[in-house]
């Protein structure tokens, strides 16, 4: 399973709320506009182009997805909550 760190900067409240709800369907919110997403790259790319980017005004907003390596995730230093997200052993698609 691949992990992605997805973050956004969206100016409009309505667009921001809609994008956050979409991300929460597949990802774990770790900060206000930052999510950890346990998704294969193909699924992430599909969601980006079919769902998430459609909610943005790309002249004003931005969305970024950074790959997280398993080793870097295990070395993460976390203070406060939430804890490091560990997805279930299986995913129903």
From Swiss-Prot:
<comment type="function">
    <text>CRISPR (clustered regularly interspaced short palindromic repeat), is an adaptive immune system that provides protection against mobile genetic elements (viruses, transposable elements and conjugative plasmids). CRISPR clusters contain sequences complementary to antecedent mobile elements and target invading nucleic acids. CRISPR clusters are transcribed and processed into CRISPR RNA (crRNA). Functions as a ssRNA-specific endoribonuclease. Involved in the integration of spacer DNA into the CRISPR cassette.</text>
</comment>
<dbReference type="GO" id="GO:0051607">
    <property type="term" value="P:defense response to virus"/>
</dbReference>
<dbReference type="GO" id="GO:0046872">
    <property type="term" value="F:metal ion binding"/>
</dbReference>
<dbReference type="GO" id="GO:0004521">
    <property type="term" value="F:RNA endonuclease activity"/>
</dbReference>
<dbReference type="GO" id="GO:0043571">
    <property type="term" value="P:maintenance of CRISPR repeat elements"/>
</dbReference>
<dbReference type="Pfam" id="PF09827">
    <property type="entry name" value="CRISPR_Cas2"/>
</dbReference>
<keyword id="KW-0479">Metal-binding</keyword>
<feature type="binding site">
    <location>
        <position position="9"/>
    </location>
    <ligand>
        <name>Mg(2+)</name>
    </ligand>
</feature>
<dbReference type="InterPro" id="IPR019199">
    <property type="entry name" value="Virulence_VapD/CRISPR_Cas2"/>
</dbReference>
<keyword id="KW-0540">Nuclease</keyword>
<keyword id="KW-0614">Plasmid</keyword>
<keyword id="KW-0255">Endonuclease</keyword>
<protein>
    <recommendedName>
        <fullName>CRISPR-associated endoribonuclease Cas2 2</fullName>
        <ecNumber>3.1.-.-</ecNumber>
    </recommendedName>
</protein>
<keyword id="KW-0051">Antiviral defense</keyword>
<keyword id="KW-0378">Hydrolase</keyword>
<comment type="subunit">
    <text>Homodimer, forms a heterotetramer with a Cas1 homodimer.</text>
</comment>
<dbReference type="InterPro" id="IPR021127">
    <property type="entry name" value="CRISPR_associated_Cas2"/>
</dbReference>
<keyword id="KW-0460">Magnesium</keyword>
<comment type="similarity">
    <text>Belongs to the CRISPR-associated endoribonuclease Cas2 protein family.</text>
</comment>
């Amino acid at each position: 399973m691949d992990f992605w760190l997805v973050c956004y900067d969206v100016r409009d409240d309505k667009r921001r709320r809609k994008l956050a709800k979409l991300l929460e369907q597949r990802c774990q919110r770790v900060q206000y506009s930052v999510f950890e997403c346990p998704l294969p790259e193909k699924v992430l790319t599909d969601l980006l182009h079919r769902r998430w980017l459609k909610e943005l005004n790309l002249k004003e907003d931005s969305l970024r997805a950074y790959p997280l390596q398993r080793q870097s995730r295990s070395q993460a230093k976390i203070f406060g909550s939430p804890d490091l997200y560990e997805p279930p052993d299986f995913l129903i698609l």
